[in-house]
């Protein structure tokens, strides 16, 4: 689910640590960074400009009993509850506008990519940052999207994903306060499992779903719902945002052409995963190539 979104989360939430070629922070504003470090000893939280303090995370050295695992997990949640990315209150007058496109892909892991023979696909040449050694710790599309949309705060339990969070936890709200226009796109109708409802109620995305009228349907989900062509959806995004008077935009795009059970119209058998993955990677590669040629300042 998160191969294509983990890098963006890190980038957005450590802007004050290194920063992109264009800064989101007002010129001259001091930065504060918080880094969690691990090892055999207890985790240490180091804050710039201050003395290191001992964190709440214990070493993972105790026997893996139920009690120890539960205790470690609870300590993890307690430590995560203190984590938050602080955004600037405003942008400087000379801040360079850019667009942000977050692509949230269902049913795609490094193991899937390897099995589909796509580890050397040209798509990877477009990436500046890749993370290959991680556990997304997500159970399904809904929780994964909520965690992504609440990326400005630390991780919570699955149960608490469906409880209100502090206002400053919602990533796209934080960007909206800095003048970024929100856009919401989906490669499906968002109805199964109440996905669209979860994105709105638990992820804080209240903007209207981008128009899906006349988008070509390339697949049907296991519930018979339409799965739209990604190239067509992304091209519509290009058209909509290009007409937008605001040159700063932040878009969340959830797509599921690789979801288990997807099949071609008129065919009941599940479509071959490898063929779907190849097509999807080819489409993203072509889209990124055209985006680079356009000269638009877009971070994907």
For each predicted feature, which ranges?
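Transmembrane and membrane-interface helices of multi-pass
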Residues: 1-53
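Extended hydrophobic/Leu-rich segments
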Residues: 44-45, 73, 291
């Amino acid at each position: 689910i998160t191969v294509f979104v983990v890098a963006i989360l890190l980038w957005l939430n450590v802007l004050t640590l290194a920063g992109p070629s264009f800064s989101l922070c007002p010129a001259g504003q001091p930065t504060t960074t918080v880094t969690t470090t691990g090892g055999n000893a207890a985790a240490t939280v180091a804050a710039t400009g201050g003395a290191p303090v001992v964190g709440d995370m214990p070493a993972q050295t105790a026997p893996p009993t139920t009690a120890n695992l539960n205790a470690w997990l609870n300590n993890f949640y307690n430590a995560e509850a203190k984590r938050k990315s602080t955004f600037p209150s405003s942008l400087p007058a000379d801040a360079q506008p850019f667009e942000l496109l977050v692509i949230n892909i269902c049913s795609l892991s490094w193991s899937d990519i390897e099995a589909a023979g796509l580890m050397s696909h040209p798509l990877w040449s477009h990436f500046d940052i890749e993370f290959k050694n991680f556990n997304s710790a997500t159970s399904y599309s809904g929780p994964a999207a909520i965690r992504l949309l609440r990326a400005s705060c630390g991780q919570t339990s699955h149960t608490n994903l469906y409880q209100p969070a502090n206002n400053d936890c919602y990533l796209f709200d934080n960007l909206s306060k800095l003048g970024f226009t929100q856009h919401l796109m989906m490669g499906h109708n968002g109805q199964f499992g109440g996905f669209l409802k979860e994105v709105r109620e638990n992820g804080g995305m209240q903007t209207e779903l981008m128009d899906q009228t006349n988008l070509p349907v390339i697949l049907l989900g296991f519930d018979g719902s339409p799965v739209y062509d990604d190239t067509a959806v992304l091209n519509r995004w290009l058209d909509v945002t290009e007409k937008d008077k605001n040159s700063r935009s932040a878009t969340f795009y959830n797509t599921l052409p690789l979801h288990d059970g997807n099949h071609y119209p008129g065919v009941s058998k599940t479509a071959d995963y490898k063929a779907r993955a190849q097509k999807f990677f080819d489409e993203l590669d072509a889209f990124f190539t055209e985006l680079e040629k356009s000269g638009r300042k877009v971070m994907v």
